[in-house]
Amino acid sequence: MPPEFELIKEGNGLSFYERWINMEDGTKSREVKFIISIKAPYENVIEVLTKEKYGMLWNDNTLAYKIKSTGPQSWISYMRYSFPFPLSDRECYLKNRLEEGKESTKIYFNSSNSRIFSEGVEMVQMTGLEGRWIVTKKQGYTLLRYHIISVPEKG
């Protein structure tokens, strides 16, 4: 069973947690979790997370943000990030799947091998990512939970 999350920082409606998990191959992976209280309607939060036009507004250091639908509640998202020297710019493709519930919506994501927005371009890929967003309706606000872990590549 993985260890409990440790609270790292808290303030202004945001709590940041982390934990280290021993993977099957012996490597350690860091999992982070954010819990954010947002004074905005639930539907608006879902729209910001799922619509291309908002991606660069909430995703820091993003040079490009694109979405391609793959089904009624699934899509591929593409982010190209700017990193300072000595790192190079990187890109990330994620498969996303949305599950709607009565009081909350979950968006699961994990790294994708797709290159639909950067075919033929040599770029460092951010891989081995998986996580989820959980958006919950509350009285007068929306609660947003974000989990992400970097999972070592197999092979």
Annotated model-derived regions:
Residues 1-155:
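Eukaryotic helix-grip
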